[in-house]
């Protein structure tokens, strides 16, 4: 069970720019923080963030699969395989930039230290591209790349289509480590969500991850739902993983329940 308190605020500057600050207090060793500067006049937003809060880049597109509450790989084990950030990223003292050009959203991320927190190993950089209403109404296409210096290259591509209350998504991700002995990964992630009404949403999904050094694919499946009543939101999920890390016979199941209040 986790608990936290978040303080946030912001305002407009006389020159047309905007400032927003968020700070979360919790039981972690470091508190999450985010500072955003809106440049005004369509010039985008610069973000500086830390701990588990990312400033931008591939995180904007690493998982576009629709879900009512949480992703199918959440809470079942310590490592989220098959994502474009699986090789590890450093979100402490991270910079980001985001802007929109017509129907194209661009998100950039940069950190002078990679996930080993060593400048000697080089910097991290990433990009996330989102094309809204691509080719037809309701269709979204995404592409992203995360370069973890000399650790790995992560690439992802996906599409999402919405028609009425129904949304479906499909995404491919490739994690290519620099060392030949590491566990390169290829993942296929798909899911569908449905808004039953303005208060209730349900979803189901599946993710399979092929790991080069193992004979069995890791498979994550799950169902979730969320219900909103006034200022109260209830979320629930049942997730299951088979062959954790590609190890046959290693399984885990988890049931999650979340209650949130908006003041």
Features from the language model and the residues they span:
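Outer-membrane beta-barrel proteins
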Residues: 1-263
């Amino acid at each position: 069970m986790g608990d936290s308190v978040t303080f946030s605020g912001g305002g407009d500057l006389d020159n047309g720019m905007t400032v927003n600050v968020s700070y979360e207090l919790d039981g972690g060793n470091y508190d999450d923080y985010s500072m955003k500067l809106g440049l005004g006049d369509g010039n985008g937003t610069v973000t500086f963030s830390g701990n588990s809060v990312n400033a931008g880049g591939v995180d904007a597109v690493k998982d576009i699969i629709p879900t009512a509450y949480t992703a199918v790989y959440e809470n079942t084990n310590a490592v989220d395989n098959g994502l474009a950030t699986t090789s590890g990223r450093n979100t402490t003292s991270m910079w980001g930039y985001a802007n929109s050009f017509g129907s194209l959203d661009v998100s950039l991320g940069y950190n002078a230290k990679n996930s080993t927190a060593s400048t000697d190993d080089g910097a991290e950089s990433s990009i996330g591209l989102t094309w809204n209403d691509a080719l037809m109404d309701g269709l979204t296409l995404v592409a992203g790349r995360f370069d973890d210096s000399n650790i790995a290259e992560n690439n992802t591509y996906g599409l999402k289509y919405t028609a009425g209350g129904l949304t479906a998504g499909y995404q491919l991700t490739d994690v290519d480590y620099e060392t030949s002995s590491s566990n390169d990964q290829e993942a296929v992630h798909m899911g569908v969500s449905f808004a039953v009404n303005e208060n209730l949403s349900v979803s189901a999904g599946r993710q399979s991850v092929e790991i080069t050094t193992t004979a069995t694919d890791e498979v994550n499946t799950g169902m979730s739902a969320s219900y909103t009543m006034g200022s109260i939101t209830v979320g629930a999920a049942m997730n299951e993983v088979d062959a954790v890390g590609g190890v046959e016979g290693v399984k885990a199941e988890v049931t999650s329940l979340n209650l949130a209040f908006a003041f």
